[in-house]
Amino acid sequence: MRTGILILLLVAGPAAHASEPTRLAAGRQSAVVLEGSSNVTDWRCRGTSMDADMLVAAPADHINAVIDRIEDGNIAVWMSEPARGRFPTPRFHLRIPVTSFRCGNRIMEGDMRRALRAGEHPDVEFTLGALRGGVQHDLDTGLYHATIAGELGLAGQRRTIDVAVSAQRISRSSFRIRAVLPLQMSDFGVTPPTALFGTIRARDALTVTFDLMLEIAP
């Protein structure tokens, strides 16, 4: 993997552009996937009905201009005017109803909803807190890699987490954001579900995959 410079984007600080914000929302191809295993088989539940909202304090033209310069290697102007290559960390919030997850099995879906206490805590939520360091550009894949901190809400419990994310510009109005988060259900007070009088037992390990297509709102 060939990597480019450590790009100091998405950092707090002065920026040389107007403050007209850009709002992005989740497109139809977005999904959040929960994956785990039991003593019998692996399981997977996928949710596509969600509210995801990102607000960047920079106009869309500036965001695209920064990406253009990075991908063209034309960044010399930032050596004397680094503020032109910056914009603040976005505000981002994701909410997905637990009842929207589909596992291909109604019994499994019911077990998952009970385990996550969907009646009391109907949503899985994530709120972006901060960017950890800079953004690395992979010259071979065109992906941007970073580590972010945020708050994950699951089954009524909230935990601050760090997660590695990758981002890609699909077009000048759409961006793909992907992250894979391994965690333990018990960290959120969730008892791994059982079925058939305890003969099938889910394991504690859970992987949450975020695969979001964010589109600039009109």
Language-model-detected regions and their locations in the chain:
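Positively charged n-region of N-terminal signal peptides that target proteins for export
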Residues: 1-4
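Hydrophobic h-region of N-terminal signal peptides that target proteins for export
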Residues: 8-17
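Low-complexity, acidic/polar, glycine-enriched regions of mature
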Residues: 17-218
